[in-house]
Amino acid sequence: MVKNIYTYTKDRLAGIEHNGFNYGFTYDVFGNTTAVSIAGNQVISYEYEAQNGKLLKTIYANGDEIRYTYDTQDRFSISYLKPAGSSEQRLNSYIYNKEGNLCKVTNHLSGKTYELDYDFLDRLMRVRDESGVCYEYTYDANNQMIRMFHTDGRAKLTTGYTYDKDGREKEVRMAGKFTRSTDYDNLGRVTKQSFSAENGDTSMSMTYKYPDAEKNKEYALPSEMDVQECSYSYKYDRNGNITEIQRVPHKGSTEKILKDTFQYDERNQLIRENSQSQDKTIVYAYDQGGNLKSVKEYAYTEGTLPETPVHEETGTYSSTWKDQLLNWDGTAMTYDAVGNMLTRGDTVYTWTMGRKLACVDNGRKAQYFYDHTGARVKKVVDGVITNYHMAGDLLASETCNGGTTWYVYDSGANLVAIIIAGKYYYYVRNVQNDIVALVDDSGKTVVNYVYDSWGKLLSITGSLKDTVGIQNPFR
């Protein structure tokens, strides 16, 4: 039996007992959170002005502190970072327009400065950075985004969107390049998505089928998905967990039909999969907190398992913070007082701003830098710099060694295409939302990705597996 116990003090959540340890929360007399603890150890605390005033400081148990100052209208003005054992330094500076909207912000650690413009309805319309990178939004009378423009300071990319009378996206358009069209059934479920060139020729399509309605039930989960080279069929249990996936190659293919089946416990945790795609049967076991504690692999079978697995991996967890993994299959892990991983085998991790990854060193050193929102804007690996250009939460483009890789999204912030060296490649996803293929603008599948049930990449195949397959970061 699994249970979480919640305790309250004056109607405020004071603790959560889970897996044999506690998460604790403390408050001041005004209800502001003053500290959070895990397994009896304080991991973060907050300081405020007197009499229910503004937040002044966030203090992390690993020694990092962030201090906040405000303008005369109580808006963030400047924040400061004091790393553990170091002196305080300026972190972010904020400037506002006369309407009170943020119009300029600078992150002093990464050197990023953004200027923000708004339309007459105070909707964010344009953002520019110090290097000339810019993105813009255009809206229609229904407050729907109909255009997104992005430039890296040299080239530019414009994506247009159209909608039906119910506000559902009908088309994503890249002027002069391609259009992705979406069809729906009378219940609003997606039934087809197709990519077509500017001349109207269809280069790729994906179709979806759903189980027939029964006993006044309609199903939102597809029972079949047909893509370029194969179709996938799905079965589910009453909780919506996938119990079977069958991959059927199209007629004329030399590939086999592959079927994977899945079993779950009463907590909807995957406990066994019989995987023809991996040619093995895998059994999973968990502790009372839902943490994976062992993985056993056997030769593929749908029947009774032999006593001894072909391969087994096990994990151990902290005796106090019982969700904290200390060792997996012989690889040890250590953490700081906040719970950030410090080492994993021979790999060393360092952190900044309390919870932001600053560096990974495993023989090659990778450093990371962030903007005021916490988005990663730069990576340096052994001296090679990659700059990431964000449009809100979306990675719009990245530049490295003089080249730019672009990303195209639909109006729901889902990836549609990637542009590498001026060539377009369309993303193909399965029902689990894994990116399983890249298709070029002629309709040819050039990269295939295979994952395990946890989303770990198992293989990359296809004619461009060693170039585009590796360059695409979304896999």
Task: Give residue spans per PLM region.
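Beta-turn initiation residues at beta-strand->coil junctions
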Residues: 1-6, 15-23, 35-41, 56-66, ...
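A motif-centric feature for acidic-aromatic and gly/ser/thr-rich catalytic loops and repeats
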Residues: 305-319, 421-475
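Structured, non-catalytic alpha/beta "coupling" segments that mediate domain-domain communication
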Residues: 282-319, 391-394
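Short, acidic, Ser/Thr-enriched surface-loop or helix-capping motifs
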Residues: 8, 28, 38, 49-50, ...
